[in-house]
Amino acid sequence: MNQKEALMKAGVLAEALPWLLKFQDCIVVIKFGGNAMVDKSLLHTFAQDVVFLRLAGLKPIVVHGGGPQITKRLEEKGIISEFKNGYRVTTGEVVGIVKDVLVNEIQKDIVNAINAMKSMAVGISGDEFDLIQVKKMMIDQTIDIGFVGNVERVDIKQIIEVLESGEIPVISSLGIDNKGQIFNVNADSAASAIAKSLRANKLVLLTDVAGLLGNYPDETTLINTLSLSELEKMIPNLDSGMRPKMESCFEAVSSGVSRAHVIDGRKPHALLVEVFTDSGTGTMITKDLE
């Protein structure tokens, strides 16, 4: 490393200092999803980011879905994936496959990636210990999409215990109803519900686009900041992929989470850029008074 490179890196560290001080002991709920889950190099850099956050004094919580891997597993079994309003139609057969992929494949990969750097990740399935309690979801009160749940309540006790032990919870987006039935839960919705229940400082959704685009797919139309009232007007016109994400951000910030962000998980270290730089990245949702 030459002197110029060293000075540039020192500048980056200096820029991070006020953010390190600001976010000490702050809870950051991170939804990890999209193609970053199937790209080993991106999984590695994501794990680095999460470990860095924890060692820097923040309290990261990872919530993950499994769209690409679930679709692949279903294809292998000859089952065609069906979606309605952005939600996967989940039959009794499919929900068992969903749990297997989420817990035994994806969660395991994330936990192992984090623990390869420092042993501090703890895997938790949302349907265990009544962690994520749900009711069956119906679209527009009439369209049945099977075993897909709306989050009713999050029992935060286990999450807090993991955080207080200095570890990182890695939570699979599953839920359970009052009859013991397991449900598939949209990972954005699960992350939002967990952030609300913990009154987190940040909710960060990693996705496969740069953020909310004014004219999709033109990334030059990226919307950097939106207030709640601005977002509320836009939600009805969003496509089925982005709408659940923005609804999750809206719900979180409306319920006391300080800020919500949608960032590009395809970019290495996007999470650190968002948290520790002045410019940030992606789209930020704030309360109307900011």
Annotate each PLM feature.
Residues 1-266, 273, 279, 288-290:
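Nucleotide/pyrophosphate-binding catalytic subdomain
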